[in-house]
Amino acid sequence: MSEIKTDDPKRGIKLRGADKTARIPIKVVPLQEKLKKPEWIRAKLPSRKFFEIKDILREQKMHTVCEEASCPNIGECFSKGTATFMIMGDICTRRCPFCDVGHGRPNMLDPDEPRNLAESVKAMNLRYVVITSVDRDDLRDGGAQHFADCIKAIRETSPNTKIEILVPDFRGRLDIALKILAETPPDVMNHNLETHPSLYRKARPGANYQHSLDLLKRYKEMMPHIPTKSGIMVGLGETDEDVREIMRDMRAHNIEMITIGQYLQPSDGHLPVLRYVTPEQFKIFEKEAYELGFSNAAIGAMVRSSYHADEQAAEALRECEF
């Protein structure tokens, strides 16, 4: 299990919205008038299956990024019987002002979480599961061993289930984290770049664009048969050419799968939406992604990193079998 530092009385206190972003380097400045949400930004209403999935998650004491990050696709994904599990708690050590996950000093790791996760996957009869996490800068391996423990637990109870992990950047702990995840590999390795490097100080304080690229390139070199994946949001202030530059950088670092979706502001305390990319422009990005050599490109306004991840990964996983 990942090692943790000594207990702290401030553990477990979660800050959200303006409280969370109060101390970031570049302050969130709201627009005088918000951009009107276009008609193509629409989420599907939940079905009865949605509530059944929520019951299973609560019973197993599991968190999903779908809920914690206020994902607009939660109704559709839960209704299909799919979910992206968020491990290591619901409190992040980073303060990214685009994200709705709470910030603070996280609680100690739950040693039962890998077993609870495996039981949830089995109860939901999932053929494909995505596991992500908050950033855990308080852990000596960034939480890599906990990811590995979760992978092992799922393999034992659901051997036919494919596993994608969406990992943090393991800042300062990359060598040990990659070693652990090479010894217990997923079926797909995902880490998001999120946005253009010129916007990192504003959108991803504490992160580094080149470090994130190197994470995926190094893992691919260690595990050439494991597909690698990354994603970005649009609407934070980037240009179309910035998006193309990111795609070229991804391919130069052997990233095979890409997601691009529209950023939606979770609250007034988060970064504002600076543009809504049209469906036509998303189609252009998709065409350009395939021309650059991505094996799969999920690109559209409502696309998120794990949205329809099972369908996106199917072709890449088939290719790896041959």
Curated annotation (Swiss-Prot):
Q: Where is the Radical SAM core domain?
A: 78-295
HAMAP family named in the record: Lipoyl_synth
Keyword Cell inner membrane attached: no
Per UniProt, the keywords (alphabetical) are: 4Fe-4S, Cytoplasm, Iron, Iron-sulfur, Metal-binding, S-adenosyl-L-methionine, Transferase
- Entry-linked InterPro entries: Aldolase_TIM, Elp3/MiaA/NifB-like_rSAM, LIAS_N, Lipoyl_synth, rSAM
* Alphabetized CDD domains for the sequence: Radical_SAM (cd01335)
This protein's encoding gene: lipA
EC assignment: 2.8.1.8
Could you state a single Gene Ontology molecular function term?
metal ion binding
Question: Top EC class per UniProt?
Answer: transferase
Its localization reads: Cytoplasm
Protein name, per record: Lipoyl synthase
